[in-house]
Swiss-Prot record:
UniProtKB keywords: Isomerase, RNA-binding, rRNA processing
Protein name per the record: Ribosomal large subunit pseudouridine synthase C
Family: Belongs to the pseudouridine synthase RluA family.
InterPro entries assigned: PsdUridine_synth_cat_dom_sf (IPR020103), PsdUridine_synth_RluA-like_CS (IPR006224), PsdUridine_synth_RsuA/RluA (IPR006145), RluA_PseudoU_synthase (IPR050188), S4_RNA-bd (IPR002942), S4_RNA-bd_sf (IPR036986)
Statement: the UniProt record of this protein carries the keyword Metal-binding: no
Gene3D superfamilies according to UniProt: Pseudouridine synthase (3.30.2350.10), RNA-binding S4 domain (3.10.290.10)
Length: 303
């Protein structure tokens, strides 16, 4: 049997075979490799060899493969195109532990009842092809900027715990309508689900909400009562920065959910961008500093 490898990223040979044949055990794979019943490009291969597009796996006809293969899944063309963009156009960093992408606004991180295309659905396609990507945090659909994606289970656990323990430093740029009273400060509030509108999050200083903390700094005064502000969330509550901007009296431009449509200028985009992420050496074994380029519409506003 001949298997042409078509995964878009290098992937361990043993894991790739297990995805094709879930009933194959590690011991059986390693024995078959030692006996050259399974080879790669006509060469003897180790289980940890990373195969990639263009490689060919040869399986001896006398080798008894398990009958059951993985379920055949069908992916939309849009998901396949997005998957390729994640690994090319959007990609700004990659190592053995993670990739970082610059997510555009209007693209959801995860799917939902009214969302057909998302980063998560594209990752499922890549994983079906042999990768092992896992989301470790999320950005609102309307928010652009840095999104980290783990490349394996162990890295996902490390990164998830780092976010949970507030070890990841994140900085966002926002253009707001109006300015805070103080140029530098801290916002603290409880954030929980609105009891009147389940689709909306509200500030509620009660036992129902969870504590949310955000540092902010006014960076620049722009035209038409618009201001550039840097936000640094300590916690990661849903819609936290959007709510805290509203609480400061300066909602984010383009925020239809928490802004005042009657007085704010119309904007096609929401001006909130995840600009910087810092990971200390203790998280994945090395210090990582990342920056995501501002989208064109954001840059035009602050020049």
């Amino acid at each position: 049997m001949i298997i042409d490898v078509n995964i878009p990223i290098p992937f361990r040979l043993d894991k790739y075979l297990k995805r094709l044949y879930p009933l194959l055990t590690q011991g059986v794979i390693e024995k078959a490799l030692r006996q050259k019943q399974i080879t790669v490009n006509f060469q003897k291969a180790e289980a940890n060899l990373r195969v990639k597009v263009g490689d060919t796996i040869f399986i001896n006809d006398y080798f008894n493969l398990p009958v059951t293969q993985h379920e055949t899944l069908v992916f939309a063309d849009a998901e396949i195109k997005l998957a390729k963009k994640i690994l090319t156009d959007y990609l700004i960093y990659e190592d053995d532990h993670l990739i970082a992408i610059n997510k555009p606004a209007s693209l959801a991180t995860q799917g939902g009842s009214k969302i057909n295309l998302s980063i998560d659905s594209a990752l499922k396609y890549l994983n079906y092809q042999g990768a092992d990507f896992k989301l470790v945090h999320r950005l609102d659909k309307e928010t652009s900027g840095l999104l980290l994606i783990a490349k394996n289970y162990l890295s996902s656990v490390k990164l998830h715990n780092a976010f949970k323990e507030k070890l990841v430093i994140k900085k966002y740029f926002a253009i707001t309508y109006g300015r805070p009273v103080k140029n530098v400060g801290t916002v603290k509030s409880n954030i929980g689900k609105s009891k009147r509108r389940l689709s909306k999050i509200a500030n509620i200083d009660s036992d129902d909400g969870k504590l949310a903390i955000t540092y902010y700094k006014l960076l620049k005064s722009l035209n038409n009562n618009l201001f550039l502000i840097e936000f640094m969330p300590v916690t990661g509550r849903m819609h936290q920065l959007r709510l805290h901007a509203q609480l400061l009296g300066c909602p984010i431009l383009g925020d239809d959910k928490y802004g005042n449509k009657e007085i704010m200028p119309y904007s096609k985009y929401m001006f909130l961008h995840a600009n910087n992420i810092y990971l200390s050496e203790t998280i994945v074994g090395k210090e990582i500093k990342l920056e995501a380029k501002l989208p064109f519409y954001f840059t035009r506003r602050i020049i």
